[in-house]
Amino acid sequence: MTGFKQHTGLVVPLDTANIDTDAIIPKQFLQKVTRTGFGQHLFNDWRFLDDAGQQENPDFIMNAPRYQGASILLARENFGCGSSREHAPWALADYGIQVMIAPSFADIFYGNSINNQMVPVRLTDQEVDELFQYVETNEGAEITVDLETMQVTANGKTYSFEIDEFRRHCLLNGLDNIGLTLQHADKIAEYEAKIPAFLV
């Protein structure tokens, strides 16, 4: 996995609180076991007027031409609540989202996002309000997120955020749970070599 250090991208503002994982990726699309192919169904019930996902809903903000290609999602509090399905961050990542900014995230969703190399940034309600105003009134508005300095830059202003040091280390170095384990492959092999054969 490639590490995340800094990203500048177009922002799509999703001005809704308590968006749950069922809305992010509806249950009928969860049959796959690979991480790809979920992006086309992201917010399926909101993005499309038909079950087949062919007729776009012109009133849903992510379908607006000005937000096509967005890689940063701006949302309200408690984003990613509901069931613990990891398919939700898979769908966001497959769609092209690299950063999510909100006042708060559901705990399991927050951890799953980091495990999938997406950066969930928590800012205050007031700071998020300022970003919504900036993005909605400036077509093509971009935001820069710097994980090394833990700062968000937008419209000439800088906002600080926090991510605990261990998770920040994983994001910066592109490490998921498997990657972390493989860092200790030599020690694991050494330990396994000492295990009596009858225990293997």
From Swiss-Prot:
Catalytic activity field: (2R,3S)-3-isopropylmalate = (2S)-2-isopropylmalate
GO biological process, one term: L-leucine biosynthetic process
Keyword Amino-acid biosynthesis: yes
GO molecular function: 3-isopropylmalate dehydratase activity
Lineage of the species this protein comes from: Bacteria, Pseudomonadati, Pseudomonadota, Gammaproteobacteria, Vibrionales
SUPFAM superfamilies: LeuD/IlvD-like
InterPro entries given in the database record: 3-IsopropMal_deHydase_ssu (IPR004431), Aconitase/3IPM_dehydase_swvl (IPR015928), AconitaseA/IPMdHydase_ssu_swvl (IPR000573), IPMI_Swivel (IPR033940), LeuD (IPR050075)
Sorted UniProt keywords: Amino-acid biosynthesis, Branched-chain amino acid biosynthesis, Leucine biosynthesis, Lyase
Entry's EC annotation: 4.2.1.33
Protein name stated in the entry: 3-isopropylmalate dehydratase small subunit
Gene Ontology CC terms: 3-isopropylmalate dehydratase complex
CDD domains: IPMI_Swivel
Metabolic or biological pathway, per its Swiss-Prot or TrEMBL entry: Amino-acid biosynthesis; L-leucine biosynthesis; L-leucine from 3-methyl-2-oxobutanoate: step 2/4
Complex and partners: Heterodimer of LeuC and LeuD.
Keyword Phosphoprotein: no
Stated role: Catalyzes the isomerization between 2-isopropylmalate and 3-isopropylmalate, via the formation of 2-isopropylmaleate.
Gene that produces this protein: leuD
Family: Belongs to the LeuD family. LeuD type 1 subfamily.
Top-rank lineage group of the source organism: Bacteria
Gene source species: Photobacterium profundum (strain SS9)
